[in-house]
Amino acid sequence: GGNVVGDAKIYDPSSLVSSQNVIVVTIQYRMGPFGWFRHPALVDNNSSLEDRSGNFGTLDTISALKWIKANIKSFGGDPDNVTIFGESAGGHNVTALFASPLASGLFHKAIVQSGVSSVSSIEASENYLPSNKSAPTDSGLEILNKILVSRGIAEDVEAAKTIQMKMSKSEKKDFLYSATSEELVTALLNDRPEQVGMTRVFPDGHVILEGGFAEAYSKNTINKVPIIFGTNKDENKFFNSANPNFVEWAPAKGLFRTAGIDQMPVKIIDPDYYDAINFYGSGFWKNSAVDTPARILVENGHEQTFAYRFDWDELREVNGVDLSRLVGAAHALEILFVMGTFDNFIIKSFLFGRGSFRPALELSSNIQSYWAEFAYTGNPGKGTNNALPLWKKWSNEGEKYLILDSTLDQGIKMSDEEYTVEFLLDKLSNDSRLSDIEKCETLFGISYDDGSGVSENVFNNFLGGICKDLDYAKTIEIINAVRTRLTIEDQEET
């Protein structure tokens, strides 16, 4: 997750492969400080543009596509019909390939599932942290500082900074090259900057344009291939459910204990507030990752643009906890339906509410059919069986995206409701579930990192300007609470 942990063996695509007669290749690429890292000492006049970029993970994915182009025919595949797809950080990486001139001709369709559309800050990556310890991107200089401290060369990061500033460029380069994998990962994950987002690509001007994905969309310099963008209705519940400020947790019992889980959710502390902040967090994510890029691409003539929203949330109640409200159509849940991996004790025990299993299987089959038809033809249409509701292209004037849900709820249908910033701000300003201060805190939290929120100017003028002078220390503490928990999980996986 987050371009920090994971490997190519996580997914089991056997159901997708067998049901749709496709070949699925899962690729391995460098992550964390090995995949995306910059330090001024690592480049010189002899460095290639690729080495200067810091986008080593992205270059790995490009190399993988070159290998596929050269070799997939030996596995029964077609090198002239390659579809790339990925979720979350993987969706971000698919977007990077879609926007990178170096990936031209290596793939022919793209599916971005819950991607992140913002990019890393080169300035932050190549400078020391400011005094408030806040930065949108991990700093290569600070990682070197933390290794100096961990080796006992410096007493603390301030002393390390003094030492590093006295080191020659070659000494810094040799020191970084001497660092072990464990040292680099530990330095990255320990005491990360406030406001840091997911590990993302650098807009270096070679692998990725200097203006990032937004420039590629607006200038229409993307790779001219059909694309699907999508998010899940309750993306943020995946993260908010782990936050003790929103959900009360206790030692596991019953099914949770049987599944080997130490802690279990007991109750949502304020359900209406929980639902409200999820709607806006997930809504602004949809705006930045789906609706805005789709609208801009279509405006610039990229007609083969499709979009979806995954809405399935018919989960069960476990030990008195309503998972359909706690988790809902959360981040990453659609992967289960794309891959069709339902034959698992934990999945069967935890996910499905009364009567929801067979409709969920049907939805999974339909999603696989759409994904495969898109891979075959560049248009998901009515699926490979030509029997599903028509998935139309994104239209700036009419219907825009396909809602993916089971027959127990909405089913599969097109929607014309676009999530613009104006639409979301209007909803937020009139939401009776939140006080004005809570509305300000919600918008601040959404805009704090990863580029899904609003500009400083828009924030300062929201609700007549009452938000700009409030104290958001508690909001930042709440954000950091879930970030700390997820970072600990990343360290354990690593």
Identify the meaning behind each predicted range:
Residues 1-165, 206, 214-241, 302:
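Serine-hydrolase-like catalytic core of hydrolytic proteins
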Residues 1-58, 79, 347-367, 378-384, ...:
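Non-catalytic accessory segments of hydrolases
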Residues 30-33, 85-89, 309-316, 386-395:
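Short, solvent-exposed turn/loop segments enriched in Gly/Ser/Thr/Pro and often Arg
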Residues 59-66, 92, 134, 138-142, ...:
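A structural signal for well-ordered alpha-helical segments within the folded catalytic domains
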Residues 71-81, 150-157, 296-306, 373-393:
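Surface-exposed helix-capping loop/turn segments at secondary-structure junctions
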Residues 109, 117, 121-127, 158-361, ...:
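Substrate-gating cap/lid region and adjacent catalytic-acid/histidine neighborhood
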Residues 390-410:
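C-terminal, flexible cofactor-proximal segment of oxidoreductases
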Residues 406-432:
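Extracellular/periplasmic bilobal clamshell ligand-binding domains
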